[in-house]
Amino acid sequence: YEADRLPAINLAGIYDRSTGWREPVNLPNGCFSYLRVDGEMYRLPEVRPISHGISLDYRHGIFHRHTTWHTARGNVTLRTERFASMDQVHVIGMRFQISADFHADIELVTGIDTKVWDLNGPHLEKISMQGQQDDMVVTAQTHEEGISIAVAEGVLASYPAEMKQIVKNHKILHRIFFITMPGETYTTDKWITVFTGKDVVNPREEALHLLQQSRTEGYDTLLERHNRRWEELWKHAEVKIRGDVKAMEAVNYSIYHLQSIAPRHTDSLSIPARGLSGQTYKGAVFWDTEMFMLDFFLMTDPATARILMKYRIDTLAGALRKAAHYGYEGAFYAWESQEGGYDACTDYNVTDVF
């Protein structure tokens, strides 16, 4: 999907003001992909499929999709799976599996789209797109603080194919050409790595290094470690309810969301009111975290609870500044807290949130 369909890879703890409200930053979209069959583009929602389904394995945080289109010469099926690694938080893994019931001329297009959707953007400048053999990398900086970000991407086809790289329409793309044998399945693995200037000194080099390491280890190894890490989390967090399977599923699905957005990758960060689902509520940390989420982590993951509490301690300086700004003594903690305790709440807030 392109920006008009609102895809977003939301960064935790990095904010920027361009126009309007200050909000979290969306990364260049390393998941951008589509298919051509016999020269014709096939993607949703532009081309209606004859069958389509999506599913989420919430126990392991894996998203699956399968889509079949009818073409002029037969049927083509695309199956994908995608996960943000719980074991190595800077990596996203994707797998494409393509099959057809005829000799189809296939072009799989996948890469990085730098034209992303923002509520009040754009938030990135000095955008650079570079290709390196089978890999590619996009670098940029945020407007306000000049924080560097890097998104690297690489693919590996398990079958003979012709590959090209192109830069076009704000995108850097792999074009993978091959011809299907009827009934055969063609698998392409893809890795996306993400680093920022808050993670490391040189995000670009770290992103490329981890990309090469992930390719060497292989998709299946990355997925196995990801699954194993999820199982470790469930040992301490899974809820079992006798006699009410639906209630049990609902509770564990909610726990999946909490586990997905826990900031285990750092030592001082909190969870925004909308998690990492987008830029609504300015990506700010409300007191919802302490009221509704903290108890769960205190009972199941004290190390993460410590990270959440340390965020409040570390934002004391921002609370002191806010109190002084309004003429008060002491500390006045933020209602909509961003980094450093900056309060993103306006003096006169929205009158119609919808």
Pin down the residues of each PLM region.
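Short, well-ordered loop/turn and helix-capping segments at boundaries between secondary-structure elements
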Residues: 101, 114, 195-197, 298-302, ...
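Segments forming glycine/polar-rich beta-alpha architectures that bind adenosine-containing cofactors
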Residues: 278-284, 289, 295
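Helix-terminus loop motifs that line ligand-binding clefts
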Residues: 262-277, 300-354
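Amphipathic alpha-helical interaction segments
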Residues: 9, 238, 294-295, 300, ...
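Acidic/polar, glycine-enriched structural segments that form the non-catalytic walls/loops
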Residues: 1-281
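Short, contiguous, pocket-lining structural segments
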Residues: 246, 284, 297, 354
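Alpha-helical support elements that line or immediately flank enzyme active sites
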Residues: 97, 251-259, 289-303, 315
